[in-house]
């Protein structure tokens, strides 16, 4: 069965990371999962490996509200750099339903979706299956 090689979760909520890991593992659609507790640690990893395609995720679930570097700051850094892997799909995964965040989401055409927490196993399954079809 075809699988997504690498998925990343960037979120400071340990419970969300844990539950997401369990759900993603249960789908059996992902080879490897890498987790980051904030945008700063994530962008440092991305920049360190920007020329190593196999080290960069195919799919990212990005929280907006995190300490140190939030999701929007991560996206600013991410879009300002060139990565060897051109197609890194990013979904916003947040509890924010604010108009400001929704409008800002629309200003990033490369963002694939805006998912409101808590997310169900079915939502994750649909995202992963859709990415496999497109990949």
Name each region found by the language model:
Residues 5-15, 20-24:
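Conserved acidic segment of CheY-like receiver
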Residues 12, 91-97, 118:
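Conserved active-site segment of CheY-like receiver
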Residues 35-48, 71:
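Helix N-cap/capping motif at the beta->alpha junctions
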Residues 44, 72-84:
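Short amphipathic alpha-helix used as the core "switch/output" element in two-component signaling
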Residues 63:
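Active-site residues of response regulator receiver
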Residues 66:
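Receiver (REC) domain active-site loop signature in two-component systems and cognate sites
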Residues 73, 85-87, 96-113, 126:
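Alpha4 helix (beta4-alpha4-beta5 surface) of REC/receiver domains from two-component response regulators
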Residues 119-128:
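C-terminal output helix
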